[in-house]
């Protein structure tokens, strides 16, 4: 952790409060997609949900995700070059002005040497820039309308899973300041930071954040892909990055890997359950629910008692 990051952390805790760091899984936690495609979401309702309809919705999402990945985020070029986070190759980026850079004509190939690592770093920087600007600059209005309708249809089919998960983020995060470090863009009154650690590839995961309206809360610096390194390694990076006694961590997901990683670091873990009668799903789980998990490991804080 460099001096600048250390100062940012000190700023966040300058009022003496604690900072809660939520480490989220994506599929079947903040969003539903895999369980729509394989039918497990609908099947959990024992016949009251149309499995075929869920599959149709999932396939529509897949189509849009892959198209935006390829058309706007260089995925055809870098699909086989997955990195755990966008800044992983920053040391190779010389800061070149990319406004007129021709990504189609730079002879990019597998980044086994410094030159191609620099070219991949350029692409990552361009992806980060597009991500922070959101969808409207590179998606035509007709497509935006289609995506808005698909979101509404999905939210209705899943009994408000998507909007409820987003409401959770709204309740405990209020982004007021733009920041390039993924830390100081959090309203200090909330003292919460949200980080995504997904088993999906990095570029499609960033696109999912955009399409499922999560990018307001998940800056590109806070999105990690664990495919090649595992969730425990990602969790360790996060712990090192936010290394301060006032920071508290909690992992939230539906899988065994994030559970094991959280246990290894002695973090609380909230298990998401698809079953309709579970309170550990969306709608259902709230910041107050998670505050009990924080308290069980770290003890009570003013932030816990203020959760509603």
Tell me the role of every PLM-derived stretch.
Residues 1-21, 26, 30-308:
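HAD-like aspartate-dependent phosphatase fold
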